[in-house]
């Protein structure tokens, strides 16, 4: 387990001291994938450097299994660095070395005997699906292949922690998914704690267990993916599962933003809401997605016929939570919608496909 306690990091410049990290507190469970996201300048890279011990924090602690790594120096620090494998945004492979030689580099630096090193390199390249590229040079590889070599090298010393610093940035969708699947697999097989530094919310949603949002050097939100998406007030939740809602049509009283809470939700909840309360419901947009064993869902609906408080209370009984929606009246800008029955085949709904209105 990794514990980051009241971490501060400042730099001296010609114009004075700049504080980049301002009291970071995080707990990263063993075997979990934790994403750290935020805009440029939020402090993500600085935090990753402090975790990987490339830089010492100005104050605060980085504890791994209870040991304060930020207080170490010399041989003790070098020894603990081996417990942290890092995958960089650009693979940082040495272009004059073959793939096998690049993976072997940390083993050679540690003084591992040749035969053992060869076996370990072959094992790692086989694990990332590149054993057939052992004699190739980095210039002969695709971007995704280079990152897989980077993962193999990061795993060479059998780390307990894997730090991925924007490792999928700039990759095509297929290569990105291959890297994410590989990270998920090695996490499970090796029991690693994975820290995923990224700005891509699709990446976070597909692979992370929990997410920390950095803003201006502080943690603004932190929690499991499902909990954030289920919280209508969470900005991170809205970014993780965005909904592009259509305007509220004429004849509807108000809009609601609806989120799935933890636990099962009837896929026919729109029908149940309409028939149970006798209200008209317009589906303005939404998205439903599986995340492990959890179903994430968010929707924007328009309602007519009952007070908002009554509708919100009924939605809670269905395992949903609602807040005032973002849709605005479109009476002056859109034609009235033709009422149709909501989906009743259990298929749920897809964002931006159609508007379902029930009476």
What are these regions (language model features)?
Residues 222-223, 231:
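ABC ATPase "signature
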């Amino acid at each position: 387990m990794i514990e980051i306690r009241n971490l501060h990091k400042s730099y001296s410049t010609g114009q004075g001291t700049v504080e980049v990290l301002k009291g970071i507190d995080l707990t990263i469970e063993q075997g979990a994938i934790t994403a750290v996201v935020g805009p440029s300048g939020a402090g993500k890279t600085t935090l990753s450097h402090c975790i990987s011990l490339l830089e010492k924090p100005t104050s605060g602690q980085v504890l791994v299994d209870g040991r304060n790594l930020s207080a170490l120096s010399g041989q003790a620090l070098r020894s603990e660095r081996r417990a942290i494998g890092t995958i960089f945004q650009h693979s940082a492979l040495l272009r004059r070395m073959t793939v096998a030689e690049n993976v072997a580099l940390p083993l050679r630096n540690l003084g591992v005997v040749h035969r053992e090193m060869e076996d370990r390199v072959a094992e790692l390249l086989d694990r990332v699906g590149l054993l057939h590229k052992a004699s190739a040079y980095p210039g002969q590889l695709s971007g995704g292949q280079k990152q897989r070599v980077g993962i193999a090298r990061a795993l060479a010393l059998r780390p307990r922690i894997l730090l991925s610093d924007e490792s999928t940035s700039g990759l095509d969708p297929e290569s990105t998914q291959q890297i994410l699947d590989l990270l998920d697999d090695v996490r499970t097989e090796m029991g690693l704690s994975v820290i995923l530094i990224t700005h891509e919310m699709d990446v976070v949603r597909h692979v992370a267990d929990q997410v920390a949002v950095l803003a201006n050097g502080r943690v603004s939100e932190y929690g499991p993916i499902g909990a954030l998406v289920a919280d209508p007030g969470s900005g991170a939740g809205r970014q993780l599962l965005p909904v592009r809602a259509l305007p509220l049509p004429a004849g509807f009283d108000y809009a609601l933003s609806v989120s799935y809470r933890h636990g099962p939700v009837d896929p026919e909840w729109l029908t149940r809401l309409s028939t149970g309360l006798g209200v008209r419901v317009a589906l303005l947009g939404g998205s439903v997605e599986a995340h492990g064993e959890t179903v994430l869902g968010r929707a924007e609906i328009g309602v007519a016929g009952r007070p908002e408080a009554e509708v919100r209370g009924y939605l809670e009984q269905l395992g949903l939570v609602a807040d005032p929606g973002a849709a605005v009246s479109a009476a002056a800008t859109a034609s009235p919608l033709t009422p149709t029955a909501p989906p009743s085949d259990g298929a749920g709904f897809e964002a931006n496909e159609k508007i379902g209105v029930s009476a």
